[in-house]
Every structure is written in structure tokens, then in C-alpha cells.
Amino acid sequence: MKNTSKEYDTVIAICRSLFINKMKDYGCAWRILRLPSLTDQIYIKAQRIRSLQENDVRKIDEDETGEFIGIINYSIMALIQLELGVADQPDLDVSKATELYDTKVKLTKDLMEAKNHDYGEAWRDMRVSSLTDLILQKLLRVKQIEDNKGKTLVSEGIDANYQDMINYSIFALILMDFGTKN
């Protein structure tokens, strides 16, 4: 197996740095967002990635990397919201938010390592566009679960879907050689 753990950590370090810098700029204003709002933000980013992948002409000179980073960070925020609930006002300082971020990343990385072992790193043979489609599918599932007030009969919950979106986004960035070029 390739050094997935190290590549994963490289991508997360870049995402984490951006998260911290945005916390310093804006505080934790995101704490007032309800889960459907975060899900919609992730959906916008995933749709933009799909558009960029399908269209030859771009009116804004950006690639998919920033959108995948956004999916990662918004998904981590959603996991934090699932744990803490929505706040009426920003209520976390940079240190506490970063601690929560790191906790969610560790749980998500542990999940990735377990699945990666069982699936034999099959994602390395996938196309980035397929990972985008899987993220969009997960988003549709999350929206349905949200519409069902969080209840599922036999399916995994919202948290597992957010974790999968984080991992798929990291896989996509690794496949795009992100982190090795930056």
C-alpha cells in the first residue's frame, strides 16, 4: 500500500491551516448554521466541482481543489454541529474550535484506515469525477435524512455520510497530487 496516511495528513494540514486562519478572520460565525444550511453549502461546492469537470469553458479561473477543501472543512463543521448543537451566537474560540476539528479529523481518519484496509485502496483506481458523484450521492442521502428529522430505518446516520464526504474529498485531492505541488 502507498503511504495513504501521510498523504492524508498532508491534505488535512492544509485544510486545517485554512480553517484556523478563517476562524481568526471571522470567528466561529458558522456555529449559528443549522445542519441543512451546512449541507447546502457542501452541495453548492460539489455541484461546482461537477460543473468544472463537465465544462470546458470557465468564467472564473479556479480549479476544483478549493471546492474539495471547502467540502472537507464544511463537513467537519457539520460534525461539530452534530455534537454541540447549533449556537445562537458564536461561542468557540480558535483553540477550542481547533481541538474539536482535530477530534473529528482523527475519528474520520480512523474510519478511512479501517475501510482502506478492507477495500484495498480501491479509491486509487477511481476517477476524481466518480468521487465527485459519490459525494453528490451522499449529499442527497443526507438531505433525505434531514428531511426525515434524522431518523433512518436501516441506514447509517448523517455523521457517517459527512465522514465519507471528507474522505472522498481527501482521496480526490490526493489523486490530483494536491499537497505535493503546494
Q: What residues fall within each predicted segment?
A:
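Intrinsically disordered, low-complexity regulatory regions
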Residues: M1-N182
